Amino acid sequence: MGQHEVTARLSELTNTFIERHHSSSRQRPCIPLNEDTRYMLDSPCVEHVDEEAGVFYWTPRPHMDFTLFDGLEQGLEVAIHPSITAFYGSYWSDGLWCSSPFGEISLIQLWNEDDMETLRENLLGHAFQKSKRRQGLTFFIGLTADDRIVTVDNHSGEVYLEEAGRPPQRTLAASLGELLRELEPTLTPYTG
């Protein structure tokens, strides 16, 4: 699965999410503005801050940075599967909840540069744990409603369902593009 296909499907998912949100509420997605969310104002996704209403409006924005894991690749001494790079490098966005044949999942997305750095650190930690347990290298892209991890096999590009610290338990799709085609965005607020 190439970068183009993953990026195209993410574009379809984000556009569907925005259209559904607008049809439901006649406005862009918004997040309550409070002490816990004020840090989120530093993002290309933020469109408008309404202090009076206590919310800020946002929309996914194209990112198209497919070099975001170059340092991680050097540190791990392994090339990261192009579908993973495309998944995280295509958009700035809040995470997206989606329905799927195997239940609801939240797709992890990058909100801003700080999020990107945190993701790199978390992926590195995940990779070290996989190596320590002598398990195949996977990278996470989402979570299920019951806290199982949706991962992509770095070698084959297959998408799996895992529990933390355990090998993959179930194959969800032959590729990330195939998985993304099976998802339908919902209006559930992301709380990742």
Curated annotation (Swiss-Prot):
Primary localization: membrane
Keyword Cell membrane in annotation: yes
NCBIfam families: PRK04968.1
Source species, domain of life: Bacteria
Protein known as: Protein Syd
Pfam families according to UniProt: Syd
Coiled coil: none
General function of this protein: Interacts with the SecY protein in vivo. May bind preferentially to an uncomplexed state of SecY, thus functioning either as a chelating agent for excess SecY in the cell or as a regulatory factor that negatively controls the translocase function.
Keyword match Phosphoprotein: no
Subcellular location: Cell inner membrane
Membrane protein topology class: Peripheral membrane protein
